[in-house]
Structure formats: C-alpha cells, structure tokens
From Swiss-Prot:
Disulfide bonds listed in the record: none
One GO BP annotation of this record: translation
CDD domains: Ribosomal_L7_L12
Originating species: Salmonella arizonae (strain ATCC BAA-731 / CDC346-86 / RSK2980)
Protein purpose: Forms part of the ribosomal stalk which helps the ribosome interact with GTP-bound translation factors. Is thus essential for accurate translation.
Descriptive protein name: Large ribosomal subunit protein bL12
The family this protein is said to belong to: Belongs to the bacterial ribosomal protein bL12 family.
Amino acid sequence: MSITKDQIIEAVAAMSVMDVVELITAMEEKFGVSAAAAVAVAGAGAAAEAAEEKTEFDVILKAAGANKVAVIKAVRGATGLGLKEAKDLVESAPAALKEGVSKDDAEALKKSLEEAGAEVEVK
C-alpha cells in the first residue's frame, strides 16, 4: 500500500508551521538538497498566517512624551488604576499597559494614549 500525493498534501496541510519547517529540514538532510527558496516562500506564508491567527494583543507604553499629566489621565481611564499606580506605570516606561486584549481594544487604547502625547506600541 503506497501513499498518494494527495494524502501527503493533506498530511502536510494539517501540520503546524513548526512541524512543516522540521519536515523540510529532515528532507534536506535525507536527500542532500537545499530548499532555500521553498523555505523563504513557506516562511512568508507562515508569517502572514500567524498574523491572521493572532487575536490577543499587548499594549506597551514606550514613552510618556512631553505631556505626562495627560498620559497619566489616559492610563488611569484605560486601566482603572489609582493616581499613584498610573503615575508609577507611566514613569517606568517602557511598560505593559494591557495584555491579551482584542485588536480593536488595543488600537483604541493606542489612539487615546497617542492623542495624550504618549509613544505606544501594540504587539
């Protein structure tokens, strides 16, 4: 009983990106070839797939900027922290403000903080 090309394709399609990378490496070693071009194409596809799959984002305050008071107010409003905690968080930048939030919430938080003068990154 032999395996058909379609069965192999289905098996590879069901694998995770890391499993596919390991499979390619093993095939390169087994057959003594280099799949550098194929890896680059697969890597680009994997990066796009990973970006689509990401549903939780972290909002990082990189710097408070010139208007620290406005940034502290924005942080308090977004996080529910007290004045002292928000001030400490802003002064300890770079610091994580919120972790595991949706893309829409992360972008809204980033926008409000940037309007207050902060430098913000969404990861």
